[in-house]
Amino acid sequence: GFIIMKYIDEQTQAQLLNMNEVILEVEKALQAFSENKTITPLRYVLPFNEQNRYLVMPALSDELNIVGLKTVSFAPENSKKGKATITGSVILSDYETGETLSILDGGFLTKVRTGAISGVATKYLAKENAKTLSVIGAGVQAEGLIEAILAVRDIEKIHIASRTFEKAENFAQNIRNRFNIKVSVFRSADEAIDSADIVVTATNANQPVYTHSLHPGVHLNAVGSFKPDMQEIPSETMLVANKIVVESMEAALEETGDLKIPQAEGILTKNMLHSELGDIISGEKVGRETEEEVTVFKSVGLAIVDIIVAQYFYKKLIQS
């Protein structure tokens, strides 16, 4: 039969989304990646119009029967025009024929997969009884991260800190309304993380956003700093961490200043990285072992995950 190519916009994705289902799909993709059952090249970054970046990320898997392409445009000046700084799309192709099945709005999908990846990390690395979640950053990614972490742990209260207090206040109200949970806003990131069991940093910062040492038992999801010169978490955190986990050993050391900068400073070596997240999912490596451990998950995204999330939305749309 004929394939009718579908465009799946943000609104449709939001209606189709069940975060618990997405988390399970994302686990499959992360595991397949770590078992070398995907082809996920390092992303291409093409500069244009001075500060803008065009990122191109193909990925496929014979194991998962998926093939697709993600594109992202990063345009920092857009915020001044009231436009999104990050836009993009995911193209999902048919594994048998290569025909284009669907083009999906990449903004919402990125928010979902970013959240889901850290949700998976939190599931395996945070304390079972974690109650307090601290989020540094009140941007687009933060909401997806909160939704995914609430799916894997019984969080009772959320702390928010952001560069702009007003933005943090507005974001907090949005989170209260949406998830019916207690949310407190802090002026300083250090105060926000001091009593937290789980910390998420999701900012566009070039410099570390907190200075305090992480307490025993904390799990950190570091999600910002997607460029080699961006550092969101202090180098010292790498020394405190008992386990540092990444999506891709290869990509992590290439793509983020959170690892590149401490590496250049001689603080972090490659053998200090505990494992890829996929190896913990498969049981090849262990996750959290004690209540006292400090665990760090550094996320830069992985195109095979975007493609599996695209497939999830496409399948749900076809079913409905």
Question: Where in the sequence are the language-model features?
Answer:
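Short helix-loop-beta connector
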Residues: 126-132, 154, 215-216
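Glycine-rich Rossmann-fold phosphate-binding loop(s) that bind the pyrophosphate
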Residues: 138-139
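N-terminal Rossmann-fold NAD(P) dinucleotide-binding loop
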Residues: 142-143
